Amino acid sequence: MIYAGILAGGTGTRMGISNLPKQFLELGDRPILVHTIEKFVLEPSIEKIVVGVHGDWVSHAEDLVDKYLPLHKERIIITKGGADRNTSIEKIIEAIDAYRPLTPEDIVVTHDSVRPFITLRMIQDNIKLAQNHDAVDTVVEAVDTIVESTNGQFITDIPNRAHLYQGQTPQTIRCKEFMDLYGSLSDEEKEILTDACKIFVIKGKDVALAKGEYSNLKITTVTDLKIAKSMIEKD
């Protein structure tokens, strides 16, 4: 089975413009989270869309689904997320397992709730690549020169930009394999390995690259929100 996992567990309000977490802010005529869920509703091969939110916001997220997505609510599961990204993925997979016991073939297309400009093409590319690989990471080519500094004061290295990519989401993983790999990590490793695909890479798994889009903006600052509003208005 193919599932979607929307990571909406953040509670940060550091934009300073609302008491709402970023994923619940209005973008155009509806919240950012709703825009994101709508993109996954368009892909018929996805069995369920599981949204992991902070426990304090579960009821609010359920109300948004009732209000904006009433025709699709049977495909959407709202569940309590974890304390960080990977534990939220873990909680999402546990919700999938509760819906239907996991099989080795089950995959979940995980995505940041605050990336509402994901395209159907990106979702479908992830699903297609995941059929033949252990995991899939969505990336775009690095357009700026990346410098490395180990002390924050002087340049240590300037890697070859031709080999560098900027990571986005979705990231698509095999559910059972993620649970096995994540469960094998020590507490110290879990603190360091905050990215699901990085876990697959260090464990020697096959992680394919899917082509992202520069428009696949992650809304984390006031400036990002202004850009997103401009993009919505143009559409």
Specify the residue positions occupied by each region the protein language model found.
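Hydrophobic helical membrane-anchoring modules
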Residues: 216-235
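Short aromatic/basic micro-patch
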Residues: 26, 117, 172, 218-219
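Conserved N-terminal catalytic core of the sugar/cofactor nucleotidyltransferase
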Residues: 34-105, 185-188
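Short beta-strand segments
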Residues: 5-9, 52, 111, 138-141, ...
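Residue-level signal for inorganic ion chemistry
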Residues: 6, 33, 92, 112, ...
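Conserved core of the sugar-phosphate nucleotidyltransferase
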Residues: 104, 117-210
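N-terminal glycine-rich phosphate-binding loop and ensuing alpha1 helix
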Residues: 1-59
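Short aromatic/hydrophobic "clamp" motif used to bind/position activated sugar donors
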Residues: 108
